Structure formats: structure tokens, C-alpha cells
């Protein structure tokens, strides 16, 4: 019988599993990752894994959210830079983040395997790509309003810009390489500006 964990222990174990999964993903990719190896490294019973996730795909989605959240927390420290040009700031964040993910997807199988999971049509709404960015967009919009630099921000529209950027970079091979980055940037800038009223 699996040990019952306190809420504090659950959070610590979940974080440790995700950190360990990140290490293993980079070493082996998602397909080669075994729950047995992961739980052994974390020091919990294999059955305890299922107290946190229903399967490996659910873990992969959480790890991607976890890693994205870490990166976005760093960007939050730069919110003051966005006051002069909110559209330009968010365009640059989406563009740089997306190009980084695209490059990693080309170089590291773990990312392309993770993108495949995120691209499935049967994902529940809370597991779609853009949802990862909702809290970040809400905080950024609140910051802009607090400082009086915007009138309105369509948070859901901006969440969908993140989703659209994912769809485009995941299908970048369909574009002539010399045009992709320009088209990609224009898409992001134009759609971001649609959802921010100054």
C-alpha cells in the first residue's frame, strides 16, 4: 500500500518529480523515459506516481507548464520595460520564446515529442498550449492597467496568440525558410496589437 503524503509532502514530491523528469527528458526524450526510472530516482514507490498523474503524457504536459512558468517568472521581473511599448514588449516575448522552442524542437527530441502531445486534437481545454500563458497575460494586463498604459486587454485573445504562434512554429517546415521568421513576427505583432487597446 502506498504511503499517504501530507499536502506539503505532495508538493515537494511533485516538484522533485518534475525536476527529475526534466533531467531525464533531456537525457533520453519522452519516449525512453520510464515511470519506474523516474520514481526510483525520486525515491517513491512506482504506484505513488499515479497519485500525481494519470499517465506519462499528463506528466509531460505538467513539465512543459512548469518550465514555461519558470521562464515567465523571469520575464515578470522585466514588466517595467513594457510600459513604453506594451505591444512591442509582448510581441518580443512571444517571438523570442517561440523561436527558442522551435530551435529546441529541431535539436532535442524531447521538445518535438512534447509538441506532438500538445498538438493532439483530443486535449482537454485546460491542457491546450495557450493555457500555460494565461496567468502571465493576466498579470501583465493588470500591470499595464495599474500604470495607465492601456485601456483594455483581451486576455483570451492574447492567449490565442500564443496558441497561434505554437501552431505556426510547429508547422514551420511548410514555409520557405527565408520567409518564415518575417511572416512569424508579422503574425505575432499584428495579432497582439488587435487585442491591446491603448
Predicted regions and their residues:
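Solvent-exposed, amphipathic alpha-helical segments
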Residues: 16, 20-28, 74-78, 161-172
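An amphipathic alpha-helix adjacent to DNA-recognition modules
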Residues: 11-19, 31-32, 52-76, 80, ...
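Amphipathic alpha-helical segments used for helix-helix packing
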Residues: 89, 100-123, 171-174
